[in-house]
């Protein structure tokens, strides 16, 4: 489901922490050449803090709080910050409770950008039914973040 995938990637790429497990991999998968250089530990910690806050805001269903982690210039294919805003509104209308668990598998830096590879899952309790349902899970998916005014924000692939 496109709606949930974008929101999950939003939370995954920029936040690391509340329910995240420790950094899983320091080396790329065998045979896979990843862009950039290994990310310094200080930057990993900054990304973890940003992720923790984004997850907290997502689970609180705080649209503005989640979107504060997305660059105004965000673009991945046709997906923009405005589209993410609409997707959040749909999710917040469908579910009365949301949970996200995200682990940053690896992060690579290239200039002011960080390629963040994450694994995670999102579940929600359907409004009016009270039923918990898995919404999305992903493994080692990339997202691009960049530092804007001293804060890490999702930036997208800019295609």
Report the location of each language-model feature:
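A mature extracytoplasmic/lumenal domain signature
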Residues: 70-73, 80, 106, 113, ...
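A solvent-exposed, acidic/Ser-Thr-rich amphipathic alpha-helical stretch
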Residues: 63-107
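Short beta-strand edge/turn micro-motifs at domain boundaries
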Residues: 26-38, 115, 134-159
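Bacterial N-terminal signal peptides
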Residues: 8-21
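Short, low-complexity N-terminal intrinsically disordered segments enriched in polar/charged residues
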Residues: 24-60, 68, 77, 103-105
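N-terminal secretory signal peptides that target proteins for export/translocation
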Residues: 1-5
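Hydrophobic pocket/interface hotspot
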Residues: 54, 65-66, 84, 116, ...
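Surface-exposed, charged secondary-structure patches
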Residues: 90-133
């Amino acid at each position: 489901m496109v709606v949930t995938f974008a929101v999950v990637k939003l939370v995954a790429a920029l936040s690391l922490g509340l329910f995240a497990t420790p950094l899983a991999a320091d080396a790329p998968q065998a045979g896979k050449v990843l862009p950039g250089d290994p990310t310094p530990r200080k930057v990993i910690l900054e990304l973890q803090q940003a992720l923790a806050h984004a997850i907290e805001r997502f689970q609180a269903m705080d649209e503005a709080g989640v979107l504060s982690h997305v660059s105004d210039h965000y673009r991945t294919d046709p997906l923009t910050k405005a589209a993410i805003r609409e997707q959040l509104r749909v999710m917040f209308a469908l579910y009365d409770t949301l949970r996200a668990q995200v682990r940053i598998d690896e992060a690579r830096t290239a200039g002011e950008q960080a390629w963040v590879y994450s694994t995670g899952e999102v579940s929600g309790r359907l409004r009016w039914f009270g039923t918990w349902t898995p919404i999305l899970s992903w493994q080692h998916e990339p997202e691009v973040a960049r530092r804007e005014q001293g804060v890490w924000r999702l930036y997208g692939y800019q295609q």
